[in-house]
Amino acid sequence: MYSFVVRALGIDYGTRRIGLALSDATGLLARPWKTIAVSGGPARVAAALAAEVRALTEEQDGLAAIALGYPRRLNGSPTHQTAAVEAVAAALRLSIEIPVVLQDERLSSREAESELARRHKDWRKRKQLLDAASAAIILQDYLDERARQAARVEGENV
């Protein structure tokens, strides 16, 4: 079993709502957690996220990392939100000591929408759950990538 915390937080940034997701204590599975309403610039958003992180670390077993969705177009070029996410990440890194990783979020909202459409017929319910579900996909991608990297390193050390 694990004797240390490997829990991670996933964030899907939006201009009106931010989706949050949490991993289990083993750092293997992501699940949607909640959506928070936000307004203001990157510093204000980072302050709201830092407050959520502090509350979470007090209530739970702590956090090992934060995976913040990094918006890019399919060809890899920046979107209209890329600079805002970079600014939020920079401000968040200044206010907390937990590593903040920018995680590629291409197609995460579409994947979340598709998954929610299979489970929930009511579009209002889907809309409520979309941001947190997108955050869970971003976080799961981060967790899977981290596991692949660990397996490669372990394979090299054999």
Could you say what each language-model-derived stretch is?
Residues Y2-I11, T15-V158:
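Phosphate- and other anionic-substrate recognition elements at nucleic-acid/protein interfaces
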